[in-house]
Amino acid sequence: MREHFNDGVEFARFLAHRFVTDKAPNSAAALTYTTLFAVVPMMTVMFSMLSLIPAFHGMGESIQTFIFRNFVPSAGEAVETYLKSFTTQARHLTWVGVVFLAVTAFTMLVTIEKAFNEIWRVRQPRRGVGRFLLYWAILSLGPLLLGAGFAVTTYITSLSLLHGPDALPGAETLLGLMPLAFSVAAFTLLYSAVPNARVPVRHALMGGVFTAVLFEAAKTLFGLYVSLFPGYQLIYGAFATVPIFLLWIYLSWMIVLFGAVLVCNLSSSRLWRRRSLPKLIVLLGVLRVFHQRQQLGQSLRLTHLHRAGWLLPEDEWEELLDFLEKEQFVCRAGGGEWVLCRDLGAYSLHRLLNRCPWPMPSRERMPANLDEAWYPPFQQAMERLQVEQEALFGKSLAHWLADGTSGAKVT
């Protein structure tokens, strides 16, 4: 039990480190800024799509009220009034204004995908037609699916089985959980569809549940803070709603991005527990696997490394690929696979050590045993090198910097 608790604490620390390393707070700030300008265009597009189907007529206002009632703290009521007014006015824009709104909505989706791709360490974002079709599907089919789901929900809640004396036991509790279920579905879809990477549905669902629960807790705590500490109203007066709403948007994006970090690292949850090896040793091990597959005429992907015993997480694999591609060791073979495109017989280890951006490991960091045929001679060579370095440079700085002259000579 204690071991599981310690593992959970270590994994939480690992996620927090990745959250900061991936610059998620900066991405949340950028998304907050984009959301401020894109919320009205997104709502306008949603209303326009729903108005195309007579059965969904008037559904947009109901959905908007539902969203603000269940996903925004009570301090957002004034903002809801303003947004409704802005959205109503936006429906009377000319085609130039409509194009501007569409571009603004697309900009928000681009910013979201960029933040997610940075978390997933995606080397190649979506381009061209693929990106356009995804965004268009979100802007067109998204509101229609939302409207259909809301219509079905409205019908279900009107049944006598959920209201009145004939209501089923626990029906009221079930209805109260519907906003949470909507949140889980939305976050699951977001985590599975937006990153340009393969995301297991199970991991996306786990992240959706985690983010939805954390979102509900944050909404409750944020509402308590606003009601118990109204000092911001004394400072901002009539404009107090605006900074509070911006703060909530920023907090919401922080939660969403932390959920993305969780989903990304669920697939490597068993890898973070391993004792980290020096990057230079990992690099040599990866080159060894590349060399073996080159001799067999085969390409390489991350799963092949895992089978060979090198349990690299996605971000470390991408970091190594950046160096290997820059040094023209490997080339892309398509389908996420890579091939060795350099003759290792014409490339010395000394040259690699000079070009490698990672330092040579000390004796303390060198693993005592490694199930690789090349490792024992490499370990012995590294130990001899460090002994010779200590013999050459082991004297004190005072010895090296002492001189008997008054000035330095440059030759």
Curated annotation (Swiss-Prot):
Keyword terms of this UniProt record: Cell inner membrane, Cell membrane, Membrane, Transmembrane, Transmembrane helix
Primary localization class, coarse: membrane
GO CC list: plasma membrane
The keyword Ubl conjugation appears for this protein: no
InterPro entries the record matches: UPF0761_bac, Virul_fac_BrkB
Membrane-crossing segments per the record: 36-56, 92-112, 132-152, 174-194, 207-229, 244-264
Record localization: Cell inner membrane
Entry membrane topology: Multi-pass membrane protein
Family listed: Belongs to the UPF0761 family.
NCBIfam families membership: yihY_not_rbn (TIGR00765)
Name of the protein: UPF0761 membrane protein PA14_51960
